[in-house]
Amino acid sequence: MTLLVGLGNPTLRYDHTRHNAGFDILDSLVSELDLSFIFSPKHNAYLCVYKDFILLKPQTYMNLSGESVLSAKNFYKTKELLIVHDDLDLPLGVVKFKKGGGNGGHNGLKSIDALCSNSYYRLRVGISKGINITEHVLSKFHNNEEPLKNAAFEHAKNALKFFIESHDFNATQNRFTLKKPLQIES
């Protein structure tokens, strides 16, 4: 089994903020598959089981995401872990896959690294960098950013669908990594 985690913050206050990119992408994937999440008090997370994947949205707030991830990882005895998260070091429209590495100051990744190690797969979704990091990651996308954000999130969702079908991280990485922002037509 593979644990596929979308990072974000719970509550309506944070809906569709930059920091909730992981939640939004998993929500879109689950909706397209005509599935739904159920809340698991045991893992303090929303869960969805599809094929041999556990899709997880921790409800602990970002800084404690590792608690939900570790709980589900141990309970389901998953062999692989893929984290979908926002990355302010990448421009909006860039989507990158990688295995392992540092947390780049991302508090959700820090929490997961501390409890689970840092040798997991990552789907990094660019949100660009703002002047005030905290305000920026907790802000919603501007209207003029929406088309590019939507295209990048759609690309990320399609990458996850490919990964679920192929079970091949390297093929997914090679096929779906975008080193430059997507080009969208106006």
Curated annotation (Swiss-Prot):
Gene3D superfamilies to which the protein is assigned, alphabetical: Peptidyl-tRNA hydrolase
Primary residence: cytoplasm
Taxonomic source organism: Helicobacter pylori (strain J99 / ATCC 700824)
Protein name (record): Peptidyl-tRNA hydrolase
Key words, A-Z: Cytoplasm, Hydrolase, RNA-binding, tRNA-binding
Active site: H19 (proton acceptor)
Entry similarity comment: Belongs to the PTH family.
Site (Stabilizes the basic form of H active site to accept a proton): D86
Biological classification of the source: Bacteria, Pseudomonadati, Campylobacterota, Epsilonproteobacteria, Campylobacterales
EC number in record: 3.1.1.29
Pfam families for the chain: Pept_tRNA_hydro
Binding-site residues for tRNA, renumbered to this chain: Y14, Y61, N63, N107
Record bears the keyword RNA-binding: yes
Positions of the record's site feature: Discriminates between blocked and unblocked aminoacyl-tRNA: N9
InterPro entries cross-referenced by the UniProt entry: Pept_tRNA_hydro (IPR001328), Pept_tRNA_hydro_CS (IPR018171), Pept_tRNA_hydro_sf (IPR036416)
Intracellular or extracellular location(s): Cytoplasm
Listed GO CC annotations: cytoplasm
GO molecular function: peptidyl-tRNA hydrolase activity; tRNA binding
Quaternary structure and interacting proteins, as annotated: Monomer.
A single GO BP: rescue of stalled ribosome
Role: Hydrolyzes ribosome-free peptidyl-tRNAs (with 1 or more amino acids incorporated), which drop off the ribosome during protein synthesis, or as a result of ribosome stalling.
Record's catalysed reaction(s): an N-acyl-L-alpha-aminoacyl-tRNA + H2O = an N-acyl-L-amino acid + a tRNA + H(+)
